[in-house]
Amino acid sequence: MKTKARNLKKVFLIALSLITASISAQKAENPDNIYDLGATINEMTLTVGGILVVATNDGLVGIKPSESTPLFTFNNFGQLKPEETEFVPSSPYIIVSQGANSKFAGIAKTKRAVIDYIKGDVIFNSENDNWNQIYTCNVILPQNKLIVSGIQKEGDKFEKITPKVAVYDLSSRKLDFSFFLSTPGKVGISKDYSITGTPLLLKDFIIVPTAQGLIAKSHTGKDLWENNIKRINWMVADASETEIYGFETTSNGKNTRIHKIGKNGEELWNDDRKVKGNVSNFEITPKGIAVVSDKNDGGDTSVFATKNESEIAFLDAATGEDVWEKAPKTKGWVQHFYIQEDGILFGIQQGGINKISFDGKPLFKKPLKTGENILTMAKTPQGLIYITSEDANIVDLKTGDQIWKKPLKYKNSAAVASTFDSAKNRYLIAANETVFAIDADSGDVSELAATKFDEKEMPNTLEIKNGNIFLGSSQNMMLLDNNGDKMYHEYFKSPGKSGFVKVLAGVVAVASTAMAMAHAAKAGANRSAFGNSNNLDSYNDYGKENKRAADMFASIGDASFTLMSQRFKATSASENSQFILTKLDDGIGLVKVEKESGKVAKEIVLKDKKPEYKVDDFGGILYYKANKSTLYTYNLNK
């Protein structure tokens, strides 16, 4: 009898385990693709083009989630250090280096390669073109060219030891032209022709900055001119390409000298113009040259340090002399800087907005006092809206007079989200657990709703969804009707420690346009090869960043850029859903939650206490490191 009971118990346990396994299997999500990379995964980078680039012990691997095998594998240089892999901003290119940072870089062989991660092709490899030393390697956009300098083992014995510059077309992968920086075999004292900055590629010629001065060549490599303006770091040309500005950082690194050069190489100013600090913004206007430079005393690096501040200068384009008798006081870092028809509008990180005419006169009746950290400055039909971590208001863009009767003030908030509700003609601002509604015409303020999120989170997303108001953070989602009444509040417990304020979403939209545009400020200037990225746009112009990126990529005329453009023309996967990492019954996992209902549409259990993953919020793909050498992908759009 006991034996029979034991057998029945055994059968029951087996049946129970099978049922449990079946339920588990139904909840578990099978990956769409499994990639065994055959080497330890060290790092994963989600690119702006939507391709995941994985650094392994063997090299780099590109993953395109729609394909079952890796898009590319680059093991030519072996394992790469993080500093040996450069993702060129706003492009499909990766520059890979080996030996560049070695103390023997000038003696031992150095290598460079350029990978098009969209096509999965190596489009330049220094070894294939017999480059023994690569000194510099720059991708130039929007021309879509590659400029390299170094020693190429081609030609006679003198040519093989003479520094050379070559320009390659990245679309055709062919050499456009090349030239030597000095005459091969020339007898005399050896001179240092090392390149000191980024070459400037113009329509008819190229200018190369060297330790001996600027060297200009035609697009066939023919000599045009040289001058003695040495150690220029970066250059900008005006629209006509007849006037060039060169920027030279002083030897102590604390100041910048600005030079103006004509198209024939002559110096157009009697003397260079020295500005304190490093130039962070440079604008050529019809009225003159606007320059923002950031001073740093080398001590406290905080933006709130009292001795660290920006200076604004306005120079006569013809002479380089100051137009303003007295520069405006900033008392902090210039965080926003816009050229308007009547003058220059700027906002300070530590608080404050002002506007100065091109001849140096104040346009605002008095400098506008604001809270710290100006998150938003934008045009509205009523005037200039500003939103900081502490307050918000709309002011007259001509005079600085406030449009709202008084600023909306709130306690310094860890996160502030805002949007415009066109149906109700009102601005909505979420700060410090409150949603404020501000009538666009009258400026009257009301507290629409309370938004107490779990884990002390603050909403960092605020959207209008079919007439309702959606708020989101890392672990919380809430929907309000247009009267502020709660329709749902869903909370998903974070897998880590709770009880601290979290500002940024746990699942970051790393493929967002913001990433591309943020990197546009290169070489100290808040501009990119595509033009100035710091524009005072209309507030809440939905989709403008995506359209800007799509148009920018489409303008290149290359197949890879076309694919990147198509990506940003498509609807983002996060438009109607949010992806959240949380604790599930079967372990840590990712949930896809619908914004309009708060319902979980998909669960993926990762079965890992500290999962390593990336989410493409735009494309709707989860990349998960299943073990040290295996990667899973899940399509979150299904």
Segments and roles (model prediction):
Residues 3-4, 18-20, 221, 597:
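A general, composition-driven signal for non-globular sequence regions
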Residues 11-21:
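Bacterial N-terminal signal peptides
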Residues 2-12:
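Bacterial N-terminal signal peptides that target proteins for export
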Residues 25-638:
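Secretory-pathway ectodomains
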